[in-house]
A protein has these predicted regions:
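Short, solvent-exposed mixed-charge patches
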Residues: 453-454
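Glycine-rich, aromatic-lined ligand/substrate-binding cores of catalytic
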Residues: 309-314
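Membrane-embedded alpha-helical bundles that constitute the cytochrome b-like, heme-associated redox core
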Residues: 1-295, 302, 317, 321-379, ...
């Protein structure tokens, strides 16, 4: 293996003044260095700076594309034939089940890897000037990947896929003014059917992949234009005026190759051990109990249990997304790029915020489930007030309290305080996702895993 890496390094580094500009060797090198800097700071090669998450995402997208192309040879985008074609794929095609497993698991891993990649960028302040636009591009890519996962989720046309997608698309109906029309446009009618499957198939196999690949290329090019990755530092370190630079080839490229091979090995191992789920055929007349959204939308579904849908989707979720897009302009994250958690105080405030969110979220969910019933306590009041306006006001008050509790006792500066609030919101959302995915049973009632609700 070491010898193979050395030969790969030689292939990259070897050059000749007489080399044909149209040779595959020269073309490949030109392409690579169009989206990669020729020189990188030596300290950015440390694995613990990025954990290879960006490279893993590229590998997972590549696996998605290649396995998706293979799946198209067997898949038929029509309600009855869709399910039957997957049965034939899994039983009659060589390695059909394995190819579908790779596609399924790489899609799920991609969501997690991109989430962690975004956290790494945020906590090292790698979204400030000159990387502000790239932060927005990265968030857009994350949302597009979620859309790609959702459109692909429906394609098996089994009970789980049909009703989980129904739950997700039902959220669109709560957008005032355009929600119902937007829902009908996406589904091609009043409910999921042949038109919806055609739309989702076209989006999943053509529209979204093209946009994702184009934005990924632009994302890497922006990293190159910004001079590569931010140079890692400790909070107490005096910034270097001129970091030590080394050639990307082979120092960076071989490390990326090692990460790519490791990521592929992990996906292939999981795909060998665990099959992608396929339940009974979709039955529009029989809703399973409970009906849950895919795990990456479970946090949003849990929000709908506690907030009026209009407030949960249009106000809380929209404001949170807007705040994340505007983070480079709000003063959050590491004040000096490359410094994890901005400072030693930033580390303490982030840990405190994470612990607070981890405790407050389950307590609030339990109180809302078994104790608080604003609709019953306020008979005659519209639900938009009792289940929307008041809970939202309480939530905003909670955030204000967290801000004050962090700013004053810890004497935190604005970047550390904004960072702690982001940590609080993220941990809260992760907790809501876990609660909905694991601790919700029949009728979306709370229950311990494996215990049936009464």
């Amino acid at each position: 293996m070491i010898e193979k890496f050395r030969s790969l390094s030689f292939w990259f580094t070897s050059h000749s003044s007489h080399e044909d500009p149209q040779s595959p060797h020269r073309i490949f090198k030109t392409l690579v260095f169009h989206i990669r800097p020729r020189m990188v700071a030596e300290r950015t090669l440390r694995f613990t700076l990025t954990f290879g998450l960006g490279g893993m995402a590229v590998v997972l997208v590549t696996l998605q594309i290649f396995t998706g192309i293979l799946l198209k040879f067997a898949y038929e985008p029509f309600p009855v034939q869709a399910y039957d074609s997957l049965i034939r794929l899994q039983t009659g095609f060589p390695f059909g089940q394995f190819i579908r497993n790779i596609h399924f698991w790489s899609a799920n891993f991609l969501v997690g890897v991109l989430f962690l990649h975004g956290l790494r960028v945020f906590f090292t302040g790698a979204f400030r000037t000159p990387r502000r636009v790239n932060w927005i591009v990265g968030l857009s890519l994350f949302l597009l990947v979620l859309a790609a996962n959702l459109t692909g989720y429906l394609l098996p046309w089994d009970q789980l896929a049909y009703w989980a997608t129904t739950i997700c698309l039902g959220m669109l109906d709560y957008i005032p003014g355009i929600g119902n029309r937007l829902q009908h446009w996406v589904m091609g009618g009043p409910q999921l059917g042949p038109a919806a499957l055609r739309n989702f198939f076209a989006l999943h196999t053509a529209v979204l992949p093209v946009i994702i690949c184009a934005l990924m290329t632009y994302h890497f090019w922006k990293i190159r234009k910004a001079g590569g990755l931010v140079v890692p530092k400790s909070p107490e370190e005096i910034p270097e005026e001129k970091p030590t630079m080394v050639p990307s080839n082979p120092n960076l490229l071989l490390r990326e190759a090692a990460v790519a091979l490791s990521a592929m090995a992990c996906v292939l191992t999981v795909a060998l051990l665990f099959d992608a789920p396929l339940g009974p055929p979709a039955n529009p007349g029989l809703s399973p109990n409970p009906t849950k959204a895919p795990w990456y939308f479970a946090g949003v579904q849990e929000m709908l249990v506690h907030f009026h849908p209009t407030f949960a989707l249009l106000i809380v979720l929209s404001l949170a997304l807007g705040a994340f897009f505007l983070l480079p302009y709000l003063g959050g994250g590491a004040a000096s790029p490359g410094v994890w958690f901005a400072s030693a105080d930033g580390r303490r405030t982030s840990v405190a915020a994470a612990i607070a969110a981890g405790l407050i979220t389950p307590i609030a969910v339990i109180l809302d489930e078994y104790v608080i019933d604003l609709a019953a306590w306020m008979p005659g009041w519209p639900q938009v007030v009792s289940n929307g306006l008041i809970p939202t006001a309480l939530f905003i008050g909670l955030l204000a309290g967290v801000y004050i509790a962090i700013r004053k006792p810890f004497r935190a500066q604005r970047p550390e305080t904004v960072q702690a609030l982001v940590v609080f919101l993220l941990v809260m959302f992760v907790m809501l996702t876990i609660i909905c995915a694991i601790f919700r049973g029949e009728g979306m009632a709370l229950r311990w895993p494996g215990v049936r609700s009464n």
